């Protein structure tokens, strides 16, 4: 069934995600703060460009957002020209941003007051996952709204799962980022250790990747880490933003996260090296620098 869809936020993730929704045959209206991005998207895909989030959401059955942080999300939803001023009763709003569970719960309640549904649905898989339409989506919210939205979310994902009530999607994404941070630091230490020991890293990785040490990061990032190439994905600035959310939420629910806190400090070191836009595998750079 063809639906009217609004997509707000055409960054490295949102741009291809909106494209997959359009390719599936839905009528897509897009908004992006940088209008040239939206113009480029319109040139490449079927759809129309809106001048504000409010305009994009008018008449939409499903509204999607993919923006940078809590402040950006509040601006495109509750701001003067935010989508909450035009979202129609009975529509479903799916937020793919990685933000705090607190703001997700706030928007869930405000949407409910206005007669439409809200799902927090952060994504994992990076730029390559978005471009390949194979993202993993972790969702928080009401089951009825989820079942209606799932076919549209499927357009850009390989796995979508309703975790629980509002905020559960964001909490799951926090766990995801904690796991990635720890794995990348461990892999960085191991690669640096192997280099210093004079080992053939390709042979080592070919061997240990078939055992218990195997990970997505090992399979997809070890070669670029060895070569000091850090332009393949999720930027350090964004990882630090996510880890800040993790640490703040951990304080709220009483969970000690000592490794996450340490790795966050290591990412701060990478920023001081000028690596703000390097991808998250760049933790190895600070180890090589310490030689």
Located regions from the model:
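Active-site-proximal catalytic alpha-helix in oxidoreductases
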Residues: 132-133, 137-140, 165-197, 209-220, ...
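Hydrophobic beta-strand scaffold residues
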Residues: 28, 49, 118-119, 160, ...
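Rossmann-fold NAD(P) dinucleotide-binding segment
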Residues: 53-116
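Interdomain hinge/lid region at the active-site interface
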Residues: 214-280
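NAD(P)+-binding Rossmann beta1-loop-alpha1 motif at the extreme N-terminus of oxidoreductases
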Residues: 1-65, 91, 96, 127
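Rossmann-fold dinucleotide-binding core
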Residues: 93, 99-177
């Amino acid at each position: 069934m063809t639906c009217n869809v609004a997509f707000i936020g055409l960054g490295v993730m949102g741009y291809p995600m909106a494209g997959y929704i359009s390719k599936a045959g839905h009528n897509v209206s897009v908004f992006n703060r940088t209008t040239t991005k939206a113009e480029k998207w319109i040139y490449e895909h079927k759809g129309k460009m809106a001048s504000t989030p409010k305009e994009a959401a008018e008449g939409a059955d499903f509204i999607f957002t993919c923006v940078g942080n809590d402040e950006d999300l509040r601006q495109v939803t509750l701001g003067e020209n935010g989508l909450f001023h035009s979202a129609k009763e009975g529509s479903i709003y799916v937020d793919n941003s990685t933000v705090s569970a607190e703001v997700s719960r706030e928007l869930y309640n405000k949407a409910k007051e206005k007669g439409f549904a809200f799902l927090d649905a952060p994504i994992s898989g990076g730029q390559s996952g978005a471009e390949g339409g194979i993202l993993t989506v972790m969702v928080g919210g009401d089951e009825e709204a989820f079942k209606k939205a799932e076919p549209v979310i499927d357009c850009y994902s390989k796995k979508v799962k309703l975790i629980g009530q509002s905020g559960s999607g964001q909490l799951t994404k926090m766990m995801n980022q904690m796991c990635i941070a720890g794995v990348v630091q461990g892999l960085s230490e191991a690669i640096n250790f192997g280099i210093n020991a004079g080992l053939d890293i390709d042979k080592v990785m070919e061997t240990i990747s078939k055992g218990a040490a195997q990970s997505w990061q090992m399979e997809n990032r070890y070669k670029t880490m060895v070569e000091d190439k850090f332009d393949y994905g999720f930027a350090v600035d964004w990882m630090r933003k996510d880890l800040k959310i993790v640490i703040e939420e951990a304080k709220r629910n009483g969970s000690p996260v000592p490794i996450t806190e340490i790795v966050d400090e290591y990412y701060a070191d990478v920023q001081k090296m000028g690596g703000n836009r390097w991808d998250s595998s760049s933790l190895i750079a600070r180890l090589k620098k310490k030689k």
